[in-house]
Amino acid sequence: MVFSIGGRRLAVKTLEVAGISPWKPPIPVGSRTPFITSVARQGQAVLPVFDLASFLRLRVQGNHPLCLRIKHPLGDMVMCIDEEMPVLHTLEPAAIQVYRGKDMPAEGSYANGLDEIPILAISQLGSCMK
């Protein structure tokens, strides 16, 4: 699934997506985990917010951002993403290449025209980022 933060396109595996909903303001909390400084309510659940926009030094775009709920190995977490609706893409395994960037943990990337779209390594979010 391809989404954007600050106009930059990123991807996650659809199996790692738990849902998309309107963004609601999070509740700030103290945390020693880099880029997790708040929590968000979704129904009865209280989930950590991973601030990928701050990590990438970007700002979420749009007046009505979306909440991307992802399945992290330690439990679901959410991210605020641009208001542009995410798009599903089907890729052949051969289309996935090594991500050359060093700005985020990625399981690989794929080419879309001249753009290289990184595929986030969800399991590494919040654990190794400083």
Where are these regions (language model features)?
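An acidic, low-aromatic, low-complexity terminal/linker signal
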Residues: 1-130
